[in-house]
């Protein structure tokens, strides 16, 4: 049984030769996009022997139109990041390199964070995971739900 068959069979509730294994890690900022991201993930995959690749997304959402979000009204000024932004394309290039290298032998799962966590963790203009209770975004939602939800 190969890795793809093992994972798909386990998900479907069928018998497997062994329980599929998967674990992942966050890589340094220098390995967050492009070829460096692909190389870090592929090296980890090959050294660990996991049954699938989980691609991390350690890239902050770029705050277009402002530097940081301090007040609920700031959310109204936030603009979508262009689909063809350099950072986004570099990340997708890294994902493609991973798929090209191992997509035939293992399933590849790409991390997509939910909007609530993304908004909370990016209010400072860079990734900041210190607000584990989501107090900042929750306070903004309570104070001005329309402005916050519009983002």
Describe the predicted segments one by one.
Residues 65-151:
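Active-site-proximal, glycine-rich beta->alpha crossover segments in alpha/beta enzymes
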Residues 1-70, 93, 97, 103:
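N-terminal basic, low-complexity leaders that serve as flexible interaction/assembly modules and, when applicable
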């Amino acid at each position: 049984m190969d890795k793809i068959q093992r994972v798909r069979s386990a998900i479907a509730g069928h018998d497997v030769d062994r329980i599929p294994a998967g674990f992942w890690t966050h890589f340094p900022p220098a390995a967050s996009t492009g070829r460096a991201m692909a190389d870090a993930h592929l090296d980890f995959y090959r050294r660990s022997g996991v049954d699938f690749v989980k691609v991390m997304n350690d890239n902050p959402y770029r705050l277009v139109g402002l530097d940081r979000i301090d007040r609920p009204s700031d959310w109204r000024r936030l603009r979508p990041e262009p689909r063809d932004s350099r950072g986004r394309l570099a990340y997708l290039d890294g994902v493609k390199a991973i798929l090209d290298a191992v997509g035939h032998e293992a399933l590849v799962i790409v991390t997509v964070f939910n909007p609530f966590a993304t908004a909370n963790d990016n209010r400072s203009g860079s990734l900041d995971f210190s607000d584990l209770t989501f107090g900042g975004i929750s306070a903004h939602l309570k104070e001005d739900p329309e402005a916050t939800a519009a983002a």
